[in-house]
Amino acid sequence: AYTYLYPLEGMKAAEFWVSPEMSAQSAAEAVSRGYTAVKFDPAGPYTIRGGHMPAMSDISRSVAFCKAIREAVGDRADLLFGTHGQFSTAGAIRMGQALEPYSPLWYEEPVPPDDLHSMTAVARAVRIPVAAGERLSTKAEFGAVLRAGAAEILQPALGRAGGIWEMKKIAAMAEVHNAQMAPHL
């Protein structure tokens, strides 16, 4: 089971979201409660527009978060790196390759999720499995993602993807393509 990282009691939220050390403390605490993965998204600030090149400071901050969290949890938990579909293809590749030494379990929507060509390019260039699907709605969309090799971890949102019955169909397609499911609830 995974959890997002949140400030612990006594931590100031404004400081937490920019502090690798505080996030590492939160991650260690989550692991002590039995979580086996922690999700975080330090590459912001995020905007309503996607497809931009992350600044070197965004990459450096993201690497610092991954390093601190990995050191805090060791091999007791996986790292789940979210991006909210914010990067250009080149930017997503640049960011993903910088994160590879920390072995995240997934790289969530590194480019806008409706840009299948770009997501496929990122999946081929980065050694972190791409996760996607919270904004996809139909099994046809998930089928296209799988056929293109754009993501190895599907994240359909139960309500958006048509409920339990459709989610089971998406899971069957994922199994055929040797992909994993991590529903976005």
List the predicted regions and their residue ranges:
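N-terminal capping/lid subdomain adjacent to the active-site entrance of alpha/beta enzymes
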Residues: 1-80, 86, 90-93, 97-101
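Shared catalytic-loop signature of beta/alpha-barrel
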Residues: 97, 103, 114-185
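Conserved, mostly hydrophobic/aromatic
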Residues: 38, 69, 82, 107, ...
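Short, well-ordered helical secondary-structure segments
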Residues: 22, 66, 74, 109, ...
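Right-handed parallel beta-helix/beta-solenoid
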Residues: 88, 111-112
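Generic preference for well-ordered secondary structure
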Residues: 22, 53, 79, 106, ...
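A cross-family glycoside hydrolase active-site/sugar-binding cleft signature
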Residues: 2-4, 39-41, 80-84, 108-110, ...
